[in-house]
Structure formats: structure tokens, C-alpha cells
Swiss-Prot record:
UniProt GO cellular component terms: cytosolic small ribosomal subunit
Organism: Agathobacter rectalis (strain ATCC 33656 / DSM 3377 / JCM 17463 / KCTC 5835 / VPI 0990)
InterPro entries named in the record: Ribosomal_Su5_D2-typ_SF, Ribosomal_uS9, Ribosomal_uS9_bac/plastid, Ribosomal_uS9_CS, Ribsml_uS5_D2-typ_fold_subgr
SUPFAM superfamilies registered for this protein in UniProt: Ribosomal protein S5 domain 2-like (SSF54211)
Upper lineage: Bacteria, Bacillati, Bacillota, Clostridia, Lachnospirales
Protein name per the record: Small ribosomal subunit protein uS9
Highest taxon above the source species: Bacteria
Family classification: Belongs to the universal ribosomal protein uS9 family.
Transmembrane segments: none
Amino acid sequence: MATTKYYGTGRRKSSVARVYLVPGTGKITINKRDIDEYLGLETLKVVVRQPLVATETVDKFDVLVNVRGGGYTGQAGAIRHGIARALLQVDSEYRPVLKSAGFLTRDPRMKERKKYGLKAARRAPQFSKR
């Protein structure tokens, strides 16, 4: 028996998350590890669950995630984006709720490149008057 899988791709900074929603009990698995084991900070766990809480589907789906690149914050944002996109495949009536909360928008903010003559993107070398 083939169970229905709903797929969504999420991106944030340099992280890319491939998210699958499977009808289940609400278990979230990231890179074959439980969410509590993978994400240490409670705030990141809240970020990941936001789309499910907004659409009141926390205990209706198991979330399987494969995420690569970036740090934990970027990965949590990418997972949130992916879950929101996958929820649209489940039911398109979730769109107004997810859109108003801003979960469907790809956050365009990226790391600014380092410029030559400077120590970092904008940090200049110390100025000496004399």
C-alpha cells in the first residue's frame, strides 16, 4: 500500500531542505535524527513547527526532512519554508493563513561578500589620524 507523501523544498541563506509530509502522529525527523536531537535550541524547534501550528496540523502529519548546507538557524528557516510549501500540496486553502504569516516567502537576505581594502563586508581597517 502506497502512502501519500507531500513534498516541499525550502531554502534559507545557504541551506536547502527537502521536506516530506506523511499522514501520521506529528513526529519530526531531520536527517534521520529526531528534532530534539538535531536542533538544540528550543527557539529553532518553535520556528520549525510554526507552519504546522498556524494550520492546526501538528498531530496530523509526520515530517521527514533532508537538509544540507548552512548553520542551524538557516536550516531551521529552510525547513519552515519547506513545510509551508508541502502544506499547500495537502490543501490549497492553507494559502491565506501561510501567506499572511509570511511562511511562503523565501527570505532573500544572504551573507554580504567581503570587499578588498576592508577587513570584512563593511568593517574598515582602524583609522589613524596621525
